[in-house]
Amino acid sequence: QSPINIVSYDAKFRQRLPKLKFKPHMEKLKTEVTNHQNRAPEFEPEDGENLYVKLNNLVDGHYKFHNLHVHNGRTRRKGSEHSVNGRFTPMEAHLVFHHDDQTHFEPTRTKLGGAFPGHNDFVVVGVFLEVGDDGFGDEPDDEECKRILKGHHPDNNENGNGDNGNNGYNGDNGNNGDNGNNGYNGDNGNNGDNGNNGYNGDNGNNGDNGNNGENGNNGENGNNGENGNNGENGHKHGCRVKKAKHLSTILECAYRNDKVREFKKVGEEEGLDVHLTPEMPLPPLKNRHYYTYEGSLTTPPCTESVLWVVQKCHVQVSRRVLHALRNVEGY
């Protein structure tokens, strides 16, 4: 049964596990917000919005995006559902994909090392979410939230610069960043935070401090792996916590919406026009190392037909997201 405590030093390293990808890549989905079974508001795609996860050689069949939702707990220290070596994070995001029975592919259940009877109806991607204050800007006001919940981010157009013709927060294929220089970049960005080579996008170059950080050779502390040496099991899998600024703003506004905040019963919904991509809550592409196991849904009926893909690298959202989610009345 899921969730589980992942013991990293007992995990078996597999060099050939597939990369986590989506088809079509970077597709923006129109979603509406509904009340999840455990009263966690979830973002479900509108009819006609199709997006699939690709995990070749791990699962067969087509798995279609079903929803995004976020879990938190009674305390900040134990908010995530999964844990690694007994350590939790304040929240955990789940990207849920359901087998598309409209295709001609039957779902299979493939255990590492061989197949066994049964099948996976779901693929769920779990992401550990940390919270922070720095780098997320001012709280969005009501007018800004109205624009965001209609599918338009005020500082984001898909391929270019931010408001007023300057270089603001950029979209998926942006270049320059926050201060009109090279700041926070999109997935295919170049330079990073301080106008130099800082935080890069998926196809960027240098890491945190203009040296070899996230997408360079070395890990978090300028050396190899998580703790300045070689990472878990001796493999060089360094992580740097990505700040999910755009996602934070969307979640803040959605959870603050009057109707969403007053969700009490399962099945309640609010037709907010929110544009999301599955990339938003995920680490950059080159840092999507993951643990995978076969388990169950974490809410009733707790069906044991889920392939879990739990991201090793964490993502940070604004602390305001945590407070807003806790203020949803029925949660």
UniProtKB/Swiss-Prot annotation:
Binding locations of substrate: 298-299
UniProt feature, compositional bias: Basic and acidic residues: 144-156
Names of required cofactors: Zn(2+)
Residue stretches making up the Alpha-carbonic anhydrase domain: 1-331
Catalytic activity, as annotated: hydrogencarbonate + H(+) = CO2 + H2O
Binding locations of Zn(2+): 69, 71, 94
Any one Gene Ontology cellular component term annotated for this protein: cytoplasm
Domain notes per entry: The Gly-Xaa-Asn repeat domain binds calcium.
Subunit structure: Homooligomer; disulfide-linked. May also be disulfide-linked to insoluble organic matrix.
Name under which the protein is recorded: Nacrein-like protein P1
Organism: Mizuhopecten yessoensis (Japanese scallop)
